[in-house]
Amino acid sequence: MKLTKKLLAMALAGVMLLTILTGCSGGKTGDRLVEEYMATFISENSVDTPITHDVPEIKTVADMFETSWLKADGSWNITSGNNSNDPKYKALKDIFASYKDSCTVTLVAFKVDSTQSELDQAMRVMMSSFYSGLPVYSSGGKTTAVKCATRLVTRENKSYRIAVIIYDHHAAG
């Protein structure tokens, strides 16, 4: 009986591992895997900085995402900056308003295809956040905590990776 339980436990563990590695357990697992890769990348550059994935606002952004937010070349079709009158940018600022005083909030979005692994997508998120991310809020100071979250959304039969990275400059340690 003990041997049977051990064999069943090992088989279940193998199936779970295979599910995670192949991404065959639904969109949430892929999202979480990209978040974990993002956190690993961030932790390499921000040693001893706590990193969480607690950004409920990403769901709101993913739900309201439209393909018109991106130009054909993949750059943002949203005008950002303090003087921006772009209603899409104002809506994003409202969504992330709780971070406005002491955080840097950067939004990233790009089209993905089925050949891109979660690792590839995470690397694109991180590189895009530096070069072509949409700055929602900017704040200076030492980073004391980081939050990152992502969602894969489908619009018009195309998939898009939406991600947010929030560098907190005031969190208590």
Where are the regions that the model predicts?
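Short N-terminal secondary-structure initiator segments
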Residues: 4, 24-45, 140, 157, ...
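C-terminal motif of bacterial Sec signal peptides marking the signal peptidase cleavage site
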Residues: 19-23
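Short, well-ordered surface patches within globular domains
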Residues: 26-92
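A well-ordered secondary-structure block
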Residues: 89-173
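Bacterial N-terminal signal peptides that target proteins for export
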Residues: 1-11
